[in-house]
Amino acid sequence: LFLEVFLIHLCSVSNKNLGQQAAAYFHHQFIVNAAPSWKEGTISDLGTVIGGSTPSKSKPEYYTDNGIAWITPKDLSVDKSKFISHGADDITELGLRNSSASIMPAGTVLFSSRAPIGYIAIADGEVTTNQGFKSVVPNGNVGTAFVYYFLKNALPTIENMASGSTFKEISGSAMRTVPAVIPD
């Protein structure tokens, strides 16, 4: 048992280190040494920014155990992996229709926009999110991995663009204007 726990810990540390190396490599290759042909633009040039929504909690018929995946920032705080397919709750078709939640495709980069700003994961299937997200559905000209690492790299800029008195939040309109390097 001790050996199993030790190996799990070792894998966790190794995965964290690999993630840090990938982020550093991205910054060096695609931000510091971006190709001269790449243009300056905004996140909107990388993909479509989509907000989330919460169906009324007073309507139990809007929630189910095996429905449409519905992700909250809390889900990303508990599951710190790069990919996510389900959170603690799912919503029903009725809940989806009676809210402004949208189904986003696999490969969407989920980005928590408040409380806290900056939890990031990639949808490993179709998902919806609550209003604590400004997610990016990558355009065809850039890949999911590029958007994922771009958002990780842009986190300080995004945090500086956030506003709010009780807690900081980045609005959808502000998120769309975050400066970005656009690959050709």
Question: Would you name each region that the model predicts?
Answer:
Residues 2-54, 181-184:
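Non-catalytic DNA-recognition/assembly elements of restriction-modification systems
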Residues 153-180:
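Specificity-determining recognition surfaces
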Residues 1-9, 134-144, 172-184:
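Proline-centric
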Residues 72-73, 88-152, 162, 171:
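A short beta-sheet element
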Residues 44-47, 148, 155, 179:
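Generic hydrophobic alpha-helical scaffold/packing signal
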Residues 38-82, 95-100, 163:
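Low-complexity, Lys/Gly-biased intrinsically disordered segments
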Residues 59-61, 87-90:
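Short Gly/aromatic-enriched secondary-structure transition segments
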